[in-house]
Amino acid sequence: MERHEQILKEIAFLELRLQSLKLELEFVRSSGSEQKGKIEPFRPNSECSATPMQTAIGKESSNPLMAISLPKAEKKHSKASEVPSPHKTVKEFSEIPKDFLRPNQGIQIPKKNEDHSSSSSKEEKGIQNPKKDFYVVYNGPYAGIYDHWGTAKKATNKIPGVSYKKFKDMLSARTSADIYTNAQFGEKLKYIPGATTSPKSFAEALTTRPSNMKSLGKPKFIKIEEDDDVGFNPEFDLKSFLYIYKYGRNLEEEHFLTDRAFTIDKKEISYLNFVNNSDPEGILESFKAGLVRFIYPSTNLQELRLLPKVLKSSVQRFRKKCIKDSEKEIFLKIKSTIPCWEDYYNGLDDSVSYRPNYLVQIGISKGVNYQPSQKMEAVVLKEQWQGIAEEKAIEFFQAIEDILSNEKIFIIYCDDRILIYSSSPKERTKEDLMAILNFQSEVSSCKLLGFHSDKICSYLNKKASVGKPYSCPQKGKAVITSGPSFSVEDTLSDTE
């Protein structure tokens, strides 16, 4: 019971304390200030300035320059005492608020609460500019999201296999980066603003060379020779071909996000199709194997950077002269033969007997014609390869005939290995027709496969004109006989 009474007394005391605090709060609010302090004591002997001369018509009491409160207080106090005391307090001058001359009577304006979000989110919120481009570097040692092309270019320059892409806003860039990192089970890519790449200290700023400074000369550096153009006769052995062949047969739908590739599957061969941000080295190896069907490059064409120079320059020429909008995407449709190897049936020599020929169409893309990849059986018997190569050669001849029948066509480039063309609203010229006919005459021969083929001879004889029958240059030579059968799986394991 004693503890109970003690608690009741404490509650009553706290209630009284609360009431007293409320009264004190009301008093502070009525006085117009929450601050406590002393003011200067009033000096009655100080001279009061006269009321300024009134220039407007009316009574003197209406003059806005007259001091009303202060003189009344001064007059009242002067009667009470003539000698000022330094110990007077605020209570003796209740007519004058202590914050009389302060704005809002000394009431402080409340400050807005600051946003305590992370610094990275603040940086991303502060860069929402619709006119600014963002660059996502997906992989490599400097992966991240950049808002300055100069910095992004340094992060991708001379780094093999790096993938990057430009976006119009931060949301698209962040979404694409997150999709990639989630598929790779990696860490979230960081946003790297251009400001972080500038000098961060005074010493660094002093040592940084201004861009507008006049140069008095250039130091001599040792020139590092770059790799020569791969051209259309690259080093390509049987092991590399079988690896690409098996890769295409084993590609599945779930690999699209990581490899940026899908396949068009046939009975014996799967043709690879590459979209933006795909690996340039993979595109090059598949191109040399003759197993590429479509390429959908980015606007910066970084996926094509390892392909032969004549192909890259032709694509750049098409973009410059045939497309007004530089942001439009394009496609490359490739039709080719497959490579053949010397003495294929008697030992499988790695040296290539004859490399693929190519027909490349360049056009404006209306979207990726995507179809999911399916895992296919990667077993081809030894005697089947000759038949497959002959069938692909005949399909190649048929594709040339289709180009000849199309009158609205423009030839971009042509030599004895490749024909690059595009559709045109205008009819083809005589120069275009001559280029197609010359290319047809170069490839329409049994030497296309490096050995004699009765099937190709029969096809060319049927398609030859009446006045110009086809004459096989290798007719009468011995045809290579078939050897024992083998599978691609066995060959791949042997070469490894």
From Swiss-Prot:
Q: Which UniProt keywords apply?
A: Host cytoplasm, Translation regulation
Where do the segments described as Disordered lie?
A: 102-128
Which Gene Ontology BP terms does the record give? regulation of translation
- Segments of skewed composition (Basic and acidic residues): 111-128
- Where in the cell is the protein located? Host cytoplasm
- Spell out the InterPro entries in the cross-references: Ribosomal_bL9/RNase_H1_N, RNase_H1_N, RNase_H1_N_sf
Gene Ontology terms: cellular component = host cell cytoplasm
Gene3D superfamilies cross-referenced by the UniProt entry:
Ribonuclease H1, N-terminal domain
Domain of life according to the entry: Viruses
Its function, per the record, reads: Enhances the translation of downstream ORFs on polycistronic mRNAs derived from carnation etched ring virus.
Q: What else is known?
A: The inclusion bodies are the site of viral DNA synthesis, virion assembly and accumulation in the infected cell.
Which family, according to the similarity comment? Belongs to the caulimoviridae viroplasmin family.
Official protein name in the record? Transactivator/viroplasmin protein
Organism of derivation = Carnation etched ring virus
